[in-house]
Amino acid sequence: MLSLSLSVANAAWPERPITLVVMYAPGGGTDTVLRTLATEMSAATGWRINVVNRPGAAGALATRYVMNKPSDGYTLMGTSSFNKYSRVGGGGDSRSWTDWYYMQAATALGSWAVRPESPYKTFEDVIAAAKASPGKLTISTSGAGGQWHEVAAVVAHSAGIELKYVPYASGQRAALAGLNGEVDIAGGGVHEHIQFVDTGKLISLQQSGLTDITTKSGKVMPSLADMLPSVQEQLPPNGTYNLGIRRDTPYEIIKQVEAAFIAAANSDKFKNMMAQRSFVAEVKVGDAADRRAAELETVSAATFERLKIPGAKTAAELGLPDPGNFNQWWPPQGYRALPPTPE
């Protein structure tokens, strides 16, 4: 495990509690992962980390809040997908790989499900009904322009249907909206649906993994790849969960936070939580995380432009390449990776 000893220059940091601002409401995947990380970071270091939620505008509200705080390491950011929707959706200008230092802990799969009494028992039923009544079937999302909105829009586009997207403050609330009959289809992540599918309260229509998922009770969450193979070339990468810190924070403090993050992500309690929620462990830090952040934003900018998402900025406006040219574009002019921690 990485050493968590402080440098002499910053031995007194932190002198007070740290605040972790989560961009979605309590109960969803982002909140669950970041709260567990905060608990395990505290256990590894003795730091006191308070978690607060500031949902809204697909992360833009939380982003502005943290950006308006001093860059002293006392206010951290908890996001999904490197907070890519804030900039792509027009809610902010900060870039994830130049203005922030993000660390990735895990990834998650998308999911659609319905109540047992729904007239739609399969993904094919939804396609047929949506084609018969374009734009009438409703699906819940974790927020306008967010991860599960993007995934649902790409699936609908690939299937040749139109849906009505109903935003909620988190993936968990989107799942509950489907459970309570507020929408025709519950959107969200596998981790937010699997417990309800397992107990028979929801029926799985599809999930974005490459293979079927079988719950503890034997219920099957079918892979979208088997029903709509062409969508795999268009789907955005699966959702990720990230801890961020302002990049203009003193370097020694950033590396202390990174060391605590890595210790937390490798803890038994964090790994057990991920297994229970069907998350996938995938830790990235440094230039690998920066590259991933830029790649995800590039894919989403192209997707939002193609789907004509209202208010979204184009790749040209954001200074991003076509996804097919990303490898040639990265690293962009002016990019500077943070130095790695000395051995």
Per-segment meaning from a language model:
Residues 1-5:
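Bacterial N-terminal signal peptides
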Residues 41-44, 65-75, 87-173, 240-273:
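Hinge/capping helix and adjacent helix->loop/strand transition within the periplasmic-binding protein
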Residues 33, 37, 62, 122-125, ...:
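Hydrophobic alpha-helical segments typical of transmembrane helices
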Residues 11-98, 136, 160-196, 268, ...:
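N-terminal (or domain-start) structured segment
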Residues 244-309:
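Secondary-structure end/capping motifs
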Residues 19, 53, 141, 203-208:
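Structural signature of the Rossmann-like NAD(P)-dependent dehydrogenase/reductase core
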Residues 18-20, 27, 51, 66, ...:
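Residue-level signal for nonpolar/aromatic packing positions in well-ordered secondary structure
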Residues 193-266, 271, 320-343:
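C-terminal lobe and pocket-closing loops
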